Amino acid sequence: MPGKRQYKVAEVLQQLAEEHSSVSEDFEEYPTLIEAAESALANDEAAGADVVLLPPSIVDALSDEEAIDDNDMMPSSLPLDVSGRVAVLVHGNNSNGEEPTSKNTSRGQKRQKLDTPQPKWANRLAYSEDIPSENVGNLLDKEPQLKDMTPFDLISRYFDAQLKTMIVEESIRYARQKNNMNFELDVGDVDIFLCIILLSGYHSLPRERLYWNRDEDVCIPFVATHMSRNRFMEIKKYVHLADNDTTVANDKLYKVRSYITELNTRFQQFGVFNKFLSIDEEMVPYYGHHSAKMYLRGKPIRFGFKLWVLASDSGYPYNVEVYCGKSANPENQSEHGLGHRVVTSLLECVTNPVCHEVYFDNFFTSHSLLSSLRAMNVKATGTVRENRLKGCPLMETKVMKKKERGFYESKCDGQVIAVKWNDNQCVSVATNFGSIQPVGKAKRWSASKKCSVEIPQPSVIRDYNLHMGGVDILDRFMATYRPMVRSKKWWWPLFTNGINMAVVAAWRVHVQVRLYLEPYLVAQ
């Protein structure tokens, strides 16, 4: 059998060049998707075309205004365009009438897997060491002044004079940079400006200018009495949150970074006063041009900024991070992956982890994460993908589906307990502190018996269902009165989302304080 021929690098490059030259390809860029599509369809001689959406070439540009009608308060549910430019790669017909035999496809370098020892799974459900537990304590014992605060006083604890002064200073600086030397702003103007923004969340009109209209069907005396239309438009034009002269390289959110940091500080001003915490994603609606904009298929909000949120099971936010995509800085890359980095970063605000339990979904959960959190005395539970359990020998899904409803199987390696439960679908949950016992009952509808039946449900799954939805509750509260005032600034949705979240946080504190003082009230 003849041996394989070995090629030199120069010979390989020459061969690739010859194959590439056999296909005529024209590469052109267009500013919009519509123009790119028209160009691709107009070429009758092309064998095909690849349309590529390119990200912006500069992420820290000083210009932050977009070509939208900010007077229109009823935005489209779909973006008119995407970030950056659109590239069209047109493939010409092969001169020989044959497809090329190979293509040179570049792939990103894969993350190197960690060489960690495999756990030894067993049927004995016992941890090698229990995580200590403490009571989280009463919020009023830590902050007794809260019982005398009105809802307005609580909101002022989040949007306080210091934060509003920062907005005043940066807005005046931005106006001077735009050569407007006459623009002035004070904290009182900011208060009225924020009130009008909040008003648009529960009293929305089709167009912004209608708030100052004198027609009886749209007239709102409160708005026109406290601030004129031109003054509101002027403040919205120059409102700013950062100094353009002190930009941060490679930070896509430098215009709102300090604002988000200040809000997180205020969310944590009373400490972490809830026992049950959850971590999940949240979307802020945004249909403009920015490289941090995300698309989530199948979500109620498909286009927008993606937030990672640590919240209580009642919907109080403690820590918020905006996801900007994969970081180019190696220092920001976690050797364990994105989910591990997000969880550990959000939990940095938890000063006494033995007082809390954390829940998250299968995007984050892995055996390595639960083991790392256990070493930090953080009690955590989450749904999990079975390929992240390091060879845990749970029953295969197709076999478990044939078992009776409510059947479950569990394994433990001394650090993590993994359980798989047969419900409507097979569900896998992993925990570093929870247990299977006591096994409870869950009501389910039986199609064969035409009635509700009770099936066994492990304790860890019941606890997960009970405490996981905190971020979803927060998202529902915020969506109820989301501000509708729009702006041409790309960071405006994050700005108004912060205002909205601060109001929800103040309301959740107010509800919790009233429940402490008047326990007969029903929590909402």
Which ranges hold each PLM region?
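Short linear clamp-binding motif
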Residues: 13
